[in-house]
């Protein structure tokens, strides 16, 4: 038996749907300024005011900057390692970042002192003043380097090879007439290129009277005929033996 929904409840649902559609259709069109105002953002003035309020009490905030310049010369390059860190006493943090020199080690998850791990901060910067841009632009090939399997040592050449188009002739079993000497000379004088050249018949060549050369010589033809006769004689004797 199907449950019957009371009529007032159906009317209430229809009325509710109608009200929702009316609100959606008749709602105010939002402008771009109103759209931007819905986002929470801090202006530049708010940031300046915030930092100024924290900077008034000099006894609470202690800014210490340690710069460590270390230049190493390797292939004409100098690297400068600079570590800048900031710690605030208001946070009651006793963990200071450690600046390490060359040769020092810090503990890892496998070995070493774990108390110093995670506190080291080293930023590597490239000193552009000491870099020779002309030297970087020229590729340097190491003669002592070994080639990987499958690689071939090639010399870098800037010359561009000239384009030589090739003409592929199709293989056919037809007998082609032997051209005259003058025609071969004209073909050698033709300039090959990518442009399509118009086709012209050779006026000096007689296309009606063409001397065809046989595929086999007279001796080869005689041998073929002799073999065919022997084959016929052999097949005839076999037929006679079957009848007997």
Swiss-Prot record:
One of its GO terms (molecular function) is intraciliary transport particle A binding. One of its GO terms (biological process) is spermatogenesis. It holds the Pfam family IFTAP. This is Intraflagellar transport-associated protein. Disruption phenotype: Mutant mice show no obvious anatomical abnormalities associated with ciliary dysfunction. Ubiquitous. Seems to play a role in ciliary BBSome localization, maybe through interaction with IFT-A complex. The lineage of its organism: Eukaryota, Metazoa, Chordata, Craniata, Vertebrata. Interacts with IFT122; the interaction associates IFTAP with IFT-A complex. The modification Phosphoserine is found at residues 58, 235. GO terms for cellular component: 9+0 non-motile cilium; cytosol. Keywords: Phosphoprotein. InterPro entries: IFTAP. The keyword Translocase does not apply. The keyword Phosphoprotein applies.
């Amino acid at each position: 038996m199907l449950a019957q929904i009371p009529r007032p409840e159906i009317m209430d649902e229809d009325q509710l749907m109608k009200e929702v559609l009316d609100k959606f259709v008749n709602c105010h069109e939002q402008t771009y300024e109103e759209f931007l105002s819905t986002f929470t953002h801090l202006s530049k003035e708010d940031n300046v005011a915030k930092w100024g309020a924290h900077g008034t009490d000099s006894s609470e905030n202690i800014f210490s900057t340690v710069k460590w310049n270390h230049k190493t010369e390797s292939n004409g390059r100098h690297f400068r390692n600079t570590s800048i860190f900031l710690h605030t006493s208001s946070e009651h943090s006793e963990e200071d970042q450690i600046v390490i020199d060359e040769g020092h080690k810090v503990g890892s998850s496998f070995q070493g002192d774990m108390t110093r791990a995670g506190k080291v901060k080293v930023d590597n910067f490239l000193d552009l003043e000491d870099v020779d841009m002309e030297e970087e632009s020229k590729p340097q090939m190491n003669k002592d380097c070994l080639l990987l399997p499958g690689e071939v040592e090639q010399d870098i050449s800037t010359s561009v090879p000239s384009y030589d188009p090739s003409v592929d002739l199709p293989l056919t079993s037809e007998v082609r007439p032997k051209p005259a000497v003058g025609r071969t000379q004209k073909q050698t004088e033709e300039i090959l290129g990518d442009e399509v050249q118009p086709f012209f018949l050779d006026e000096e060549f007689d296309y009606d009277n063409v001397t065809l050369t046989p595929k086999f010589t007279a001796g080869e033809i005689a041998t073929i005929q002799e073999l065919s006769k022997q084959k016929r004689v052999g097949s005839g004797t076999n037929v006679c033996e079957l009848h007997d």
